[in-house]
Design a protein with these regions (language model features):
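Hydrophobic pocket/interface hotspot
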Residues: 18-22, 28, 67, 112, ...
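A generic structural micro-feature
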Residues: 1, 40, 55-61, 88-92, ...
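Glycine-rich portal/gate segments that line the openings of hydrophobic small-molecule binding cavities
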Residues: 40-84, 182
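Intrinsic-disorder/low-complexity, polar/charged segments enriched in Ser/Thr/Lys/Arg/Asp/Glu/Gln
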Residues: 2-10, 45-47, 60-62, 76, ...
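Hydrophobic ligand-binding cavity/cleft-lining segments
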Residues: 1-45, 49-55, 161-183
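Beta-strand/loop substructures that line and gate deep hydrophobic ligand-binding cavities in soluble
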Residues: 69, 83-133
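Generic structural detector for well-ordered beta-strands
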Residues: 8-10, 51-53, 66, 99-101, ...
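A conserved amphipathic terminal alpha-helix motif
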Residues: 121-156, 168
Length: 183
């Protein structure tokens, strides 16, 4: 199942500070629910994992993200990611482009376009539910992203407890949104 998700949001931080954070996958991963970077392969390639909890079961994906384009002058980035369920029940791939725009008030606008392809157990939920779950996850990402931007810089190898994404409760909220006609 293929999805395209376009999101734009603003943060009250200068573009250079946002770019420093957004152009480092190790920092960004700390904002993604259930995700972690496990290994730096080279300057543009990272291995990682993400856990998704659906009801009582947990689905674990392992994969790789690679920066294919990094334009520091224009604050644009393109990332490709791919991963496999460790139990062989599916896979996912993603192409994400991001662009930053400085705002007159000193803040930054973040523009993100993601093309996602999901195969297997998660794809069985259907595109409307997956889209709603993605919207909820993106909201959590934005909240965490804004909080981490405001923290003093302590390096990018932050240690944190990684908890699986609770897609079961997200799917329930997403289903309620679908039935209310919000998607």
């Amino acid at each position: 199942m293929a999805l395209k998700i376009e999101k734009t949001f603003q943060v009250n931080e200068p573009v250079e500070k946002v770019w420093d954070f957004l152009s480092d996958p190790r920092k960004v991963a700390t904002c993604v629910p259930g995700a972690q970077i496990t290994e730096k392969v080279d300057e543009k390639t990272y291995k990682g994992a993400i856990s998704v909890k659906v009801g009582p079961s947990v689905t674990d994906y392992k994969g790789e993200v690679r920066i294919v384009r990094l334009d520091n002058q224009n604050h644009e980035i393109e990332i490709l990611g791919k991963g496999q369920d460790v139990r062989g029940r599916g896979s996912a791939s993603m192409k994400m482009t991001g662009k930053l725009r400085a705002l007159p008030d000193g803040g930054t606008e973040v523009i993100s376009v993601s093309e996602i392809n999901v195969v297997g157990i998660l794809a069985q939920m259907g595109s409307r539910i997956i889209t709603e779950v993605s919207n909820i996850m993106f909201g959590e990402f934005i909240k965490s992203f804004q909080e981490r931007l405001q923290q003093p810089s302590e390096g990018s190898s932050e240690t944190r407890e990684v908890k699986p994404i609770k897609a079961g409760s997200m799917a329930w909220e997403a289903a309620k949104g679908v039935f209310r006609g919000k998607s």
